[in-house]
Amino acid sequence: MRKKREFIDGVFYHVTSRTNDRIRVFENNLGRKIMIITLQDAKEKYHFKLANFCVMPTHIHLLIKPSFGADLSKIMQWLKAQTAKRWNFTHGSTDHLWGHRYFARPVKNSSEFEYVMKYIDENPVKAGLAAAPSEWKASGAFYRLHGLELVDSDLFDRQPEVILL
């Protein structure tokens, strides 16, 4: 049996989750749309802060701070299960969508926060999917540029105080 993950309240986590066998599930607009809508639904259900995200063809990146007392594992379990359910429904499939575990790393300070923000933003550029971060529509960079609400842009006015580690 796996050891239960322990998380620290009030801290941002850089979360990465891969698709099963790195299948390019989110390669097309429908796949990315399913992921983003499910992420919006998860945000409404669990009330977490989302500083950044990026939906890549074979994986996702999140920079997320669960609300106090919330369990990041439950958030990720729900997010991955709902995405798989919606994907399978729209594709008439029963396949496993996600790989086994997600990776979650606490963000320790403001310089690391800035590094993770940039790392997530640059992911589609490094993969050759976009010339600039804000050109990738399934990303926090695009959402911030266009004032879309999924990303909590108010966090950037008070960035140093949101990181408590």
Task: Kindly give the residue locations of the regions a language model identified.
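Short Pro-Cys-Gly-centered "Cys-loop" motif that presents a nucleophilic cysteine in a tight turn
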Residues: M1-T58, K65-L165
